[in-house]
């Protein structure tokens, strides 16, 4: 049998396994968007059964033989097929010792955790989620203990899963660099910065008008509307089941219209990635293999670098006035720009400004690193969270809902949060390169975001799933990730915004 014939057989197995993966994803989407509370337990069981079927299909002797043989000899395969085999082999090496029973139990635990988190958040009571989080940590440790190629710590292993090649040493250095320049800038703004008007930010804006604006923004970003759906959820996310079925979610607050604007732009960035990977990637099962940091790069790019720019605020200002029906008639374009960029330490990560956002990420990074590595207990999380928010941001956390329960991420294995900060830094570096090819902000000022989408499609989306993070950013920009570009961008922008001398 030729190697191409072997890959053809492997592809058929992956085609079948993908049916179960998509079914799980659709049930999860329903659970987070529209399933009744009383139906969540059954949905969780259904998802675990389907996950078990997917697991068994990708852990047969035939599957293992095809993957290992092709990994040893990939002659005849296309470059994309070779990358697929490489990804599958890495996953196989990590999962090959996990019994099906353990995988099923882990799936049940993760699915139960979501409903427990939602209940706990609504009650503002961490104790209702405490046992689920402890269970997730325990199962994660069990699965990682079965790996043959051990990392220095549990959290190092999780970082390598989410950011290929990522490690505590790498991220400690990255966050040290950010902390050294962001914290002094925040303090300077608090001590010397000019006042910025934000009183109008809490004016009521009817949800139907916010929804209409969301759809308008998604169209501006260049998303294919017939391949997309927009819904609401407690904690916004975007998922997809191929390039022609992308699901975007947001959350509307009547007294915080800005939250939805930037959530929509953020999630729309994820959706653009999903709609614009090469067809070959989907056909050969390479799609969606990029790291979380690569994905968050694009969502943060549209949310902040485009969405909060003077150019884009100039464009959307008249549309916002039109849709709001006079609610913001006394607000000038400049006042809107300053308000959506105002740096004010607060409680909520999702609604954080561009400057203090990374401090929110550092807190989560430090906590999940500690609880995954057994340095703190689950019971210590709420108090430590509150203390870190006081130390880093100078704010008092009133309850668990606005504290350690605000994010959905700990209903799954830890390690995702650093991706947001990495993505922010990647984005600025990519923008510097993009600006060499065309006037990005002249396009944004006209509301013409299609050249941006097309450039990203050609230079970013086209290689992400078949490269490591370092290969990817070097291919796009000519150098490895350099956080200095991100920090210089923040210093320049916020010094000008607050008239710092």
For the regions a protein language model found, what residue spans apply to each?
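All-alpha helical catalytic cores of prenyl diphosphate-utilizing isoprenoid enzymes
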Residues: 175, 179, 207-211, 217, ...
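C-terminal, non-catalytic "cap/extension" segments appended to globular domains
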Residues: 2-6, 22-28, 38, 42, ...
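Contiguous, non-catalytic segments that form substrate-binding/exosite surfaces or channel walls
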Residues: 106-257
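Post-HExxH zinc-binding segment in Zn-dependent metallohydrolases
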Residues: 288-329
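Secondary-structure capping and boundary motifs in well-ordered enzyme cores
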Residues: 42, 102-105, 132, 174, ...
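A well-structured
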Residues: 1-166, 466, 491-500
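Acidic/polar loop patches that form or flank catalytic/metal-binding clefts of enzymes
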Residues: 226-227, 280-284, 308-318, 378-379
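Active-site recognition of the HExxH zinc-binding catalytic motif
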Residues: 10, 148, 259-278, 296-300
